[in-house]
């Protein structure tokens, strides 16, 4: 059992890539552990740690790749009762540049 994982999401050749990271569910057994997300310049743009943030609502992050052309996710799960569910995708440009489909009703509630 290795409690620490690091995933590096790399650009696959898309110009102006943006990563969409969805942190869907997090459980830290015995109040120990963390999940951190870093942009391509190494700046930490998201963190969740400890008991008071277990099973909290989804976090949906839009992250520019920057010069290094990657995004990094670090997870520390200190025991076998801990878990994190994370999904991601890579887009060309940001979500605001996407075209809306005429039949879809879209509302933006909160953008961070």
UniProtKB/Swiss-Prot annotation:
Component of the acid-insoluble and acid-soluble organic matrix of the aragonitic skeleton (at protein level). It comes from the Eukaryota. Keywords: Secreted. Its main location: secreted. One of its GO terms (cellular component) is extracellular region. It is found in: Secreted. This is MAM and fibronectin type III domain-containing protein 2. It comes from Acropora millepora (Staghorn coral).
